[in-house]
Amino acid sequence: MINDINNFIESKKLSLNSRKSYHYDLKQFYKIIGGHVNSEKLALYQQSLSEFKLTARKRKLSAVNQFLFFLYNRGTLKEFYRLQETEKITLTQTKSQIMDLSNFYQDTDYPSGRLIALLILSLGLTPAEIANLKKADFDTTFNILSIEKSQMKRILKLPENLLPFLLESLEEDGDLVFEHNGKPYSRQWFFNQLTDFLNEKNEQQLTAQLLREQFILKQKENGKTMTELSRLLGLKTPITLERYYR
């Protein structure tokens, strides 16, 4: 299995730090299961994660699930296994608390899904707005995005941690940020890309709407008033934001 771990890591385009992280987590996984994958061994491994914090557990589960899929895809495993996080964040918690989603900025097999998630999380955009984003809407000199919708124009500041992932997409051919043969992708494509990315990060409970809610909570924490936030979101009225300011 050690060779399988090395082959798996080599198959992914990872930074040095990410390679070390994957290797450490999967080596730990190997030691616990003894190189044999079955339901009992996986249950034993999952039990061993109880001592770790939720963020660390999610990282380890993500690495192991990707590795298990790799083994299944190659035919090494005859049965498909997938570990689930037992301590799920409830919908109530998601609505009321800012989540630690720093793993969204790490390596992924779904770069389009990651960019969609980060555009929602960082700018509060809806999937429909993202689907219509033109590269000309971005000013990379001043790091701003201009969006015009329903005769309302808003200027959004691009966060520094979003730029590396965004610039990579802006350098590709085409007028739209996301397009195929000059045409925008379907709504189902955006949904699938985002879902695949969220599954990879063990955040299956999240949706585009809940990611947008994270943007709202963060902006409120940063001191934005209800009126200011409604302008950032392109809302005609701030009424729908009232519940966040009670």
From Swiss-Prot:
Start and end residues of each Tyr recombinase domain: 84-246
PROSITE patterns in the record: CB, TYR_RECOMBINASE
InterPro entries named among the record's database cross-references: CB (IPR044068), DNA_brk_join_enz (IPR011010), Integrase-like_cat_sf (IPR013762), Integrase_catalytic (IPR002104), Tyrosine_recombinase_XerD-like (IPR020876)
Positions of the catalytic residues: K149, R212, Y244 (o-(3'-phospho-dna)-tyrosine intermediate)
GO cellular component, one term: cytoplasm
Coiled coil: none
Main localization (coarse): cytoplasm
Keyword Zinc-finger: no
GO biological process per UniProt: DNA transposition
GO MF assignments: DNA binding; tyrosine-based site-specific recombinase activity
UniProt KW keywords: Cytoplasm, DNA integration, DNA recombination, DNA-binding
Protein's name in the database: Tyrosine recombinase XerD-like
SUPFAM superfamilies: DNA breaking-rejoining enzymes (SSF56349)
Source superkingdom: Bacteria
Organism: Streptococcus agalactiae serotype III (strain NEM316)
Cell membrane in keyword set: no
Matches recorded under Gene3D superfamilies: Intergrase catalytic core (1.10.443.10)
Domain Core-binding (CB) intervals: 1-72
Lineage: Bacteria, Bacillati, Bacillota, Bacilli, Lactobacillales
Compartment list: Cytoplasm
Function: Putative tyrosine recombinase. Not involved in the cutting and rejoining of the recombining DNA molecules on dif(SL) site.
Similarity comment text for this entry: Belongs to the 'phage' integrase family. XerD-like subfamily.
